[in-house]
Amino acid sequence: MLTKVNNIYFSGINGVGMSGLARILAADGFNVAGSDLVRKPVTKDMEDLGIKVYIGQVEENVKDKGIDLFVYSTAIRETNPEYKYIVENNIKKIKRGELLAEIMNRFDGIAVAGTHGKTTTSSMLSVALLEKEPFIVVGGFIPEIQSNSKIGNSEYFIAEADESDNS
């Protein structure tokens, strides 16, 4: 899915799972942009990495922007103006969970799943393996890395899987 892709757009980019993936892909050399309904502390973190973040979700955010891949979560409805434009213009789209799987397939991945304790378990695992320099995307803030995600320098990838979107 990421072959022949340069410009990636995240609708709902301030979400904990979306922001982690956006930061990792930006660090990997992709041009990343996205939108959300409100600014959050993570917005500035992404802007500091060169990620363009639009506040508000309107067609103009995605129209004629050369988007190769549109990433969305279960929070984005078919009535969303950005989503509607992407569908009407046959731009490639992918759900957040599918993108996570696509990225993790390039690594030795560990995904933490379940109904309770995913964030705690994936965070503890991430801290325990920090010296192995893994890529990390979890559902909560990890004090040891001052983020919910980390660009790694190894073959390891730790993620929190979310049953709400089958990731």
What are these regions (language model features)?
Residues 1-52, 65-70, 88-91, 123:
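ATP-dependent carboxylate-amine ligase
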Residues 55-57:
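A short alpha/beta connector and helix-capping loop motif
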Residues 4, 24, 47, 60-65, ...:
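Phosphate-binding loop of NTP-binding sites
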